[in-house]
Amino acid sequence: MQALFTLTPAESKRLIGKGIAALPEVQNAKKNGYLLVSRGSTTAYCLEEILGQKVDKERYLAGQTIRGVLCVLDAGERARPITLHKGEILPVEPTTVADKLGPGDIVIKGGNALDAFGNVGVIMVNPAGGTMGSFYMGMKARGLEIIYTVGLEKLIPSVEEAARYGGTMMIGKSIGCKAGLACVADGRPFTEIDALEALFDVSAVHFASGGWGGAEGAVTLIVEGPDDEVNRCMEFIEAKIKGEPALPGVKGPCKTCPIGACNFKGKDDQNLPGYLK
């Protein structure tokens, strides 16, 4: 049997979070090793599902796309990224344990773009590359795993092509932050499709995208499988996923923002365009 449903971005994030938390390798890393969950809107949902408790999701991020611009939340407004070791939350920054990571340990990182070839794009504003600069090369050198959570709303034609453009020193003008883009060709993307197939004995396809009236950025999916599994999946979607509210979003004052690569840096609220006030 086939079944069809549509998910808003918030609903997709909740589904991805539940799918990530159900992965045996994530459960193993949480119980027996290190599990690092980097900041991001989607990874915040993953963290809630992994911990089984509420997280201040709108502050569990650094870079964000908010009010129609690329933006960075002030460091003082951000929640600390969570590092788990053998089931316990460590009161440390993830970078302090980077050299301790070994086989079975996992980093969960959000993505900003995805293409049909499985390439993941990660936006970078920090001159040192942010999380990518701190973890990617070291993890790659040791053959360790980073799972990139990325919703299908972020599909673009080619991450490889997009990554040839941009860069904070190469962009002459911008509305919002200037940024570069890393193309991760060897990562493990985890989308709504992966979540559905991790949770149920079904196959899933991305059927359509878009919407309005609160469904902007929505994705429509079809699942197919045995009747009982499809029914179980649809009951889950209706009971656990549909109706997930959108995050309100938190934007710091442009006046005191430390990010230099933004045309709004240093501006008082009265000098900002209406969509940013």
Show where each model-derived region lies.
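Conserved phosphate- and dinucleotide-binding cores of soluble alpha/beta proteins
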Residues: 1-2, 7-15, 77-245, 254-271
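Long, contiguous binding/interaction regions
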Residues: 277
